[in-house]
A protein has these predicted regions:
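Conserved donor NDP-sugar-binding/catalytic core segment of glycosyltransferases
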Residues: 127-155
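Short beta-strand/loop segment that forms part of the nucleotide-sugar
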Residues: 49-61, 89-91
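Short aromatic/hydrophobic "clamp" motif used to bind/position activated sugar donors
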Residues: 113
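Cell-envelope/extracellular polymer assembly enzymes that use nucleotide-activated donors
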Residues: 19-22, 52
Length: 156
């Protein structure tokens, strides 16, 4: 008697349709861009429970300017982006952008990542579209050679 075939269809859940993503943001002295960074995180059209925002801040020279100088500031940002998880790290030495991106990618929590710069505006579908391209093309990395530059008069 032939064996019964198992149902090979996987159920679609947020976990497999929208995998967990670490949003990686390297920065130094970018405090004026915090409202823009928060707006990007809040308006991504992606399940917020699947996201972690991992910020790496560093020192440059004698200045010690931190994006998140204390627990009170961190809590305020966490409340603004909830339920996105916030992971903030400060390293008290000068680092190149390449060092920061490497550190972030080695220490991220989730299996996928998106590099999100502090002073850029992202369309709301940025994360969903990136995951869609990865799955559709069966590749491990996606990006775009095209950029749109705008110069807002607002001082974020």
């Amino acid at each position: 008697m032939p064996k019964k075939k198992k149902n090979s269809k996987k159920s679609i859940t947020a976990e497999n349709e929208f995998p967990k993503i670490s949003i990686l943001t390297p920065l130094y002295n970018r405090n004026k861009w915090l409202p823009l960074m928060i707006a990007n995180i809040k308006y991504f059209d992606y399940p917020k429970e699947q996201l972690e925002w991992y910020i790496l801040d560093s020192k440059d020279g004698e200045e010690d300017i931190r994006l998140i100088p204390n627990d009170f500031t961190k809590k305020n940002i966490e409340d603004m982006i909830y339920p996105v998880k916030l992971k903030y790290e400060y390293i008290p030495r000068k680092m190149t952008i390449a060092e920061k991106r490497t550190h972030l990618s080695k220490n991220m929590t989730h299996p996928y990542f998106a590099n999100v710069d502090s002073d850029d505006i992202y369309v709301d579908s940025y994360l969903k579209y990136g995951i869609h391209l990865l799955k559709k093309s069966k590749v491990g990395l996606c990006g775009s050679p095209q950029m749109i530059f705008i110069y807002p008069h607002l001082d974020y």
